[in-house]
Amino acid sequence: MSLGLYLHIPYCFSKCRYCDFYSAPGQRGVPRAYVDALLRELSRFAPDAPLRPDTLYFGGGTPSLLDPADAARLIAAAQPLPGAEITLEANPETVTEDSLRAFREAGVNRISFGVQSARDSQLKTLGRPHTAKQARAAFAAARRAGFENISGDIMLALPHYTQAEFDETLELIEDGGAPHISAYLLKIEPDSAFGRTPPEGLPTSDEAADFYLYAVEQLEHHGYRQYEISNFARPGYEGKHNLIYWDCGDYLGIGPAAHSCMGGKRFYYPADTEAFLRDEAAPVMDGGCGAEDYLILQLRLRKGLSLDEYKKRYGREFSTAQLAFVKNCVKSGYANFDGHTLALTPAGLIVQNSILAELL
């Protein structure tokens, strides 16, 4: 079974107004002590031999604040398998051609830029520290540094959003040479700045759904095939690391607030960077990964849920009532079902939670 390794880099310049992920804002770099703590935990999980993961993902926070030499130390300690996908999340304003070239030489072979919008006024509303000009420059620098596997993030249904804003952002990322795009609907999280003070001009839920369907249509038209609810790629550039999550493979997350599922068991690190640095944040067990998780995650994917694989893994079959519900979903245009595989359509992905409520 494949193994994905996630290394959490919580440090960032400032917290974006929509973000409720665990992070440590106000930083201009990643302390060497934090890198040493990650290395300490890596050695605990693999005391006798390297982990040899199939994928390695530096997430955050802002992982591009890492010194490339420290990224090289972490990659060398994990010793990913030959051909492993090694991803670094990056903010456009934090990188240069030289730093990207150094990350490439360290072993990073996939870069993911948080673009979100091509409009500076919107970026300011979101609390993003970069400009559209910096985003364009980051893509160009990545290509010159030797990156081919590049991804860009787009946020949908932002305040005062229009289809034209989406088109401009798609153009920026496509012109940047990115073969992968993640497109997310803005979600107002209670613990975010937007949750405490909602912005004006938010689309209604129906308008947000229309923006999502428009984005799917346009991305497909531009050659980005949808393979997951929020992810689109040209052939061969699907994100391998996240596919391990969605296929219920083994993944190990190291760092404050990082989650793992290994051998069917879930665990996580407490969301406390200082405790992690002091070696006072042991992983906490959090139940198991079971049939319900598999169903939920597989229905995020456009390939859908194989009922044969579902039965093989968990000994479960859909009941008569569940099959009748699936039939109604097909009639409503929310799903495709051939008797063996259930796959949600883009319209079905929008109401995925309601569909899951009937199937679980």
Named regions from a protein language model:
Residues 1-9:
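Immediate flanking context of iron-sulfur cluster ligation sites
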Residues 2, 23-47, 52-316:
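C-terminal scaffold of the Radical SAM
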Residues 10-21:
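Local cysteine-cluster metal-coordination motifs and their immediate loop/turn environment
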Residues 316-328:
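Short amphipathic alpha-helical interaction segments
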Residues 331-340:
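A short, conserved structural fragment
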Residues 341-345:
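Minor-groove-contacting beta-hairpin "wing" of winged helix-turn-helix DNA-binding domains
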Residues 347-360:
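Short, amphipathic alpha-helical interaction segments positioned at domain boundaries
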